[in-house]
Amino acid sequence: MPRRREVPKREILPDPKFGSQDVSKFINVIMQAGKKSVAERIVYGAFAQISGKAGKDPLEVFSSAVANVKPVVEVKSRRVGGANYQVPVEVRPSRRMALSMRWLREAARKRAEKSMAQRLAGELLEAAEGRGSAMKKREEVHRMAEANKAFSHYRF
């Protein structure tokens, strides 16, 4: 446990285009090497493709994609008497959001389309429908937790 006081969470300003804190958070997740304008171009480009290609509201698609990918449980390693057990634990709401955004980013990066905006749009559309690599990752994490249910009494 840290001895100093707990550092308060920073307030993230909503993004200028959609007025959503979640979109702003997602832009920060996409950002590499501090290039926020590039990250904004990628995310807004993906949203434009979603509204153009699918004819759906990009904010609704984004929020449903993030909600679908959110994990409920995950496994954490716990050492008990010389053996490491994978103990299933419930995921905190803030971590759920962070994990789902991270998984969406990684799934988009692995796709085959040309631009990152196209890859991100495709992954968001698939995740909103309950398909795609990010959903596969979530199912994998849930499967691991289910398989190690026997060790759930080793709480943290």
Swiss-Prot record:
Keywords: Ribonucleoprotein, Ribosomal protein, RNA-binding, rRNA-binding, tRNA-binding. The gene is rpsG. The keyword Thylakoid does not apply. This is Small ribosomal subunit protein uS7. Part of the 30S ribosomal subunit. Contacts proteins S9 and S11. SUPFAM superfamilies: Ribosomal protein S7. PROSITE patterns: RIBOSOMAL_S7. Pfam families: Ribosomal_S7 (PF00177). Belongs to the universal ribosomal protein uS7 family. The keyword Endoplasmic reticulum does not apply. Signal peptide: none annotated. CDD domains: uS7_Bacteria (cd14869). One of the primary rRNA binding proteins, it binds directly to 16S rRNA where it nucleates assembly of the head domain of the 30S subunit. Is located at the subunit interface close to the decoding center, probably blocks exit of the E-site tRNA. Transmembrane segments: none annotated. GO terms for molecular function: rRNA binding; structural constituent of ribosome; tRNA binding. GO terms for biological process: translation. GO terms for cellular component: small ribosomal subunit.
